[in-house]
């Protein structure tokens, strides 16, 4: 039985090793299709690392783990996988999974049995983008996925609590980062209700993306819950990355009394309505109304952080959510 895996392997990184180790773990002889220099020159955006160098690095990695392997030069993405009758298993990444389906279509049309496909999950760098040779060659990350250049995160806000919450989350991911504040935006309302909350959070994120790695849009709004017939205050977060992937998350919500809702419907924000009710001039941005209500046991910044975290949950396990990245 033979397991096949293919690639360019320009910079042998954690993602490549996951593919190779999975192939070895099948217990079969492993055939590695290594793309030729000509293929790399035609199809990759980075300078070609010579075949001989890539071959030697790949060989040295494999020989320490198994002697049941061969490395074959291939000149296209499919190699000889569509035609080899002895191949039984193919190991692929999420990016190359569609190609394996095409390979099986060709095999079937050639009267050969389809290959068993083993799809290896994404291997993410610190910044939650997949590790790739392109990123390593560009000096953005190292072969283990550690971020080298600053992770740039844009946010459209004039609220320091939102900036602090974003920075706190990003700091958990990487040590090298830059928060880029965008204050040049205009919203159609200062107090969104219902789906306006989601729309304005999306607008904030879109206007902050620019040339950043991520952009974050956070909006607090009022949503109506039909079962209890009550209104709730929530924070909604939209995250857009440089590849165009969009993820969303929401904080837990707390009920707003009807008399405050009535004040808000007279063209007031939640903060203005609550301040008027208490006869106070201003509410601290970090503490928020929830801080006043709970006597400091909860703060608005906690709810903001919760919405950010929940928007990034999908990025922590993109395979579970069937997400597809399309990095260069």
From Swiss-Prot:
Task: List cofactor names only.
Answer: Mg(2+); Mn(2+)
Give the primary localization class: cytoplasm
Gene Ontology molecular function: any one: ITPase activity
Q: Which domain of life is it from?
A: Archaea
- Segment Phosphopantetheine adenylyltransferase: which positions? 1-152
The reaction(s) catalysed by this protein are: (R)-4'-phosphopantetheine + ATP + H(+) = 3'-dephospho-CoA + diphosphate; XTP + H2O = XDP + phosphate + H(+); ITP + H2O = IDP + phosphate + H(+)
Details of cofactor binding: Binds 1 divalent metal cation per subunit; can use either Mg(2+) or Mn(2+).
User: What subcellular compartments does it reside in?
Assistant: Cytoplasm
Q: What is its EC number?
A: 2.7.7.3, 3.6.1.73
State the family it belongs to. Answer: In the N-terminal section; belongs to the eukaryotic CoaD family.
PANTHER family linked: NON-CANONICAL PURINE NTP PHOSPHATASE_PRRC1 DOMAIN-CONTAINING PROTEIN, PTHR34699
Which named protein is this? Bifunctional phosphopantetheine adenylyltransferase/NTP phosphatase
Q: Which organism is it from?
A: Thermoplasma acidophilum (strain ATCC 25905 / DSM 1728 / JCM 9062 / NBRC 15155 / AMRC-C165)
Per the record, the gene is: coaD
């Amino acid at each position: 039985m033979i397991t096949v895996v293919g690639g360019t392997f320009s910079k042998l990184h954690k993602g490549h090793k996951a593919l190779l180790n999975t192939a070895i773990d099948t217990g079969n002889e492993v055939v590695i299709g290594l793309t030729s220099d000509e293929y790399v020159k035609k199809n990759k955006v980075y300078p070609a690392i010579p075949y001989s160098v890539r071959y030697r690095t790949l060989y040295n990695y494999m020989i320490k783990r198994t002697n049941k392997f061969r490395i074959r030069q291939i000149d296209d993405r499919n190699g000889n996988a569509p035609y080899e009758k002895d191949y039984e298993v193919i190991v692929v990444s999420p990016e190359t999974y569609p190609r394996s389906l095409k390979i099986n279509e060709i095999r079937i049309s050639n009267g050969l049995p389809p290959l068993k496909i083993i799809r290896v999950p994404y291997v993410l760098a610190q910044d939650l983008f997949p590790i790739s040779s392109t990123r390593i060659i560009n000096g953005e990350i190292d072969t283990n996925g550690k971020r080298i250049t600053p992770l740039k995160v844009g946010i459209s806000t004039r609220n320091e609590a939102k900036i602090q919450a974003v920075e706190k989350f990003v700091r958990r991911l990487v040590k090298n980062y830059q928060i880029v504040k965008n204050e040049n935006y205009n919203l159609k309302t200062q107090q969104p209700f219902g789906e306006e909350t989601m729309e304005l959070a999306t607008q904030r994120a879109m206007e902050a993306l620019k040339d950043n790695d991520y952009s974050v849009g956070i909006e607090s709004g009022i949503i109506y819950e039909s079962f209890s017939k009550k209104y709730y205050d929530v924070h909604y977060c939209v995250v857009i990355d440089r590849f165009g992937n969009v993820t969303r998350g929401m904080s837990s919500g707390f009920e707003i009394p009807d008399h405050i809702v009535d004040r808000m419907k007279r063209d007031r924000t939640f903060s203005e309505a609550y301040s008027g009710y208490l006869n106070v001039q201003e509410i601290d941005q970090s503490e928020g109304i929830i801080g006043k209500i709970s006597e400091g046991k909860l703060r608005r910044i906690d709810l903001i952080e919760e919405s950010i975290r929940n928007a990034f949950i999908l990025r922590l396990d993109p395979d579970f959510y069937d997400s597809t990245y399309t990095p260069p």
